[in-house]
Amino acid sequence: MTKKYDLVIVGGGPAGLMAARVAGENGLSTALLERKTDITQVRRTDGGILSPVNEYTFGQTVVYNHEAKKISFPVSGFSISYDGPHKDVYGFNLYSPNGNKFTFGDRVEQRKDPKKNRYGVAVDKALFLKPLLEEAIRNGVDVFPGTNVTGIEKKGDRVAVTGNGKTYEGCFVIAADGVNSRIAGLMGMNKERKFCATHLQNFWSLEGIEIPEIEGLGFIFCADKTFSVVSTCHENRFSVGVSSYRPCDDLPAALNRFVHEDKVYSHWFKGGKKTKETSCVVNMYSPMKEPFKDNVFFIGDAAWLTEIANPGALCCGWKAANAITLALMDGKINKEGIGSYLEWWHKYFYGPYGKKEIKALELQDYLDADDIDYLVGLVKEPLFGTLDFYKLIDTIGSTYGELFPTIQDERPQIMAKLLGLVNQMEEAEQEVRKAGFPSK
């Protein structure tokens, strides 16, 4: 038997749960379909960091009020409840194979006024997802966990979604099913997008360790792989991971060597206990210029290159559900009715960032350990503090652009490699795409 709703939401992450909460608050008959049986359980790689704090990304900023147990989004005008541990995040460190580093942000200055100077807040993701789910249910949303969506089609003025042999119809559908969106594949949305790479990650949760110099994120360029160390909201617990654009790479083995054998960094993890291991595989496509087709919205990660981050996903869910509410009120159950969302998406997401080229390259293919040590060691002072990925990339680019004369003078052979990399960029990108396995 077909169940009929105003709105059907596929995906119970931050974007989907926020959309469900808002749709329920607004009185829409709503169904939420989620593949996991325990919707708020975080089973894949996620650092749990909320940012931007004290800066703007995608036109938004985050305010965390520990005393009120609220995470607020003052630009959009909503908040969510959070009653759990937290830790201030002060920035980003970049390390070379032999221990050179530079930082984004000055920790000494930042710590003088943490609330004003932090760039993010580490939280327990499950503990802010849980209230969203509970509020959605209280607001009358029908929730169907353990539902694997296998089909979607337009039927007249409605959209039918099939999962586990059952059909759910809505005037609108929100696809909030993540960066590897099945709905996007079923509806042919990826055909017009550029496939960039398949990105793999493997992470361990390590308890019982202290790394005082990392109060946020650390990226470590070792001789063979790039590793990351993320400070979590829990004391003496870090998330340590490795990534690659080569699906054939043995990432667990590489991570094991880094944690237990690396001559420079393994001391960070001495005595640590591995309590959890997670992985993720992301097929990276260029962002959607228009994330809407046949009354289906694609929001959050489903419409972006990689993860749009938790705050971005929450804002997408909030905006989409409100746009659909107005469309139904105005009797415009079509693209015109939700035009406010598409304008917002283009203004804050696709317009500023959608055409930016992200180069999916393995730096170690072009530079050896000594080269990377030299380049990292050139940066003597803290750089502009931020957790905005695009600002990080721009800052690195402008910093080394100014250092090119020094590199040419001191290490002309490294400069030649850098120029060679620029000339080989297209070929390198083709190799990365060839190694991947794009979603259909």
Cite the ranges covered by each PLM segment.
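N-terminal Rossmann-like FAD-binding beta1-loop-alpha1 element of flavoenzymes
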Residues: 3-32
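Short, well-ordered coil/turn residues at beta-beta hairpins
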Residues: 11, 176-177, 299
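N-terminal FAD cofactor-binding segment of flavoenzymes
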Residues: 22, 35-98
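Predominantly flavin-linked oxidoreductase catalytic cores and closely associated redox partners
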Residues: 36-38, 131-266, 304
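FAD/FMN-dependent oxidoreductases across multiple families
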Residues: 86, 246-328, 332-335, 339-340
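Helix-loop-beta segment of a Rossmann-like dinucleotide-binding subdomain
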Residues: 101-127, 158-160, 233-245
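Active-site-proximal substrate-binding core of FAD-dependent oxidoreductases
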Residues: 322-372
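C-terminal auxiliary extensions adjacent to catalytic cores
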Residues: 365-440
